[in-house]
Regions:
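Short, well-ordered beta-strand segments in beta-rich or mixed alpha/beta enzyme
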Residues: 5-11, 21-22, 55-83
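Generic alpha-helix initiation/capping and coil-helix boundary signal
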Residues: 2, 31-34, 74
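Intrinsically disordered, low-complexity terminal tails and inter-domain linkers enriched
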Residues: 15-32, 113, 117-128
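Non-catalytic surface loops within mature trypsin-like serine protease
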Residues: 13-15, 74, 106-109
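Short amphipathic alpha-helical segments
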Residues: 17-53, 86-90, 94
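An amphipathic, aromatic/His-enriched active-site/gating alpha helix that lines ligand/cofactor pockets
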Residues: 46-52, 71-105
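Low-complexity, intrinsically disordered short peptide segments enriched in small/polar/basic residues
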Residues: 2-5, 15, 20, 104
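Glycine-rich beta-strand-turn "strand-cap" elements at beta-sheet edges
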Residues: 1-3, 55-64, 90-134
């Protein structure tokens, strides 16, 4: 797979804490709005060079939790995509609502019909265990 990068953006619909005993889900209108915006964001990202695959999913056990997962040919391709006009218009406003956490992951192991494939990290030696600079 080479330099494939996995980007995971997680979202929580609705405001305030959810009572775990009564998870009824987000407001249907808010959910439709989120789905429409997420579909436009995914389409904009899919139109960029280096885009490999993308999916939007909802948590099976909590209808307020969503995930937009995309795969890119490289971290550079993903970062260039974020700079495109169409992505700035259609995706950036949605991505700004994502849970504030790291989103880009280098793929080091993958599984397929042929078994497990191992990839080396692109991080410099000694950097693999060092926290990111802030």
């Amino acid at each position: 797979m080479g330099d494939v990068v996995l980007v995971v953006n997680r979202f929580v619909l609705g405001a305030g804490p959810v009572d775990e005993r009564d998870v009824t889900g987000p407001d249907p209108d808010a959910e439709r709005d989120f789905l429409d915006r997420a579909e436009r964001a995914l389409a904009a990202l899919a139109g960029c060079a280096g885009f490999v695959h993308g999916e939007l999913g909802r948590a099976a056990d909590d209808p307020t939790r969503w995930c937009l997962a995309t795969r890119w040919a490289s971290i550079g391709a993903y970062r260039r995509a974020l700079g495109s006009y169409q992505v700035k218009v259609a995706a950036t406003p949605l991505l700004a609502e994502a849970v504030d956490e790291p989103t880009g992951y280098e793929v080091l192991r993958s599984a397929g019909a042929d078994g497990i494939t191992a990839e080396d990290s692109d991080r410099a030696p000694g950097e693999a265990n060092r926290p990111p600079r802030r």
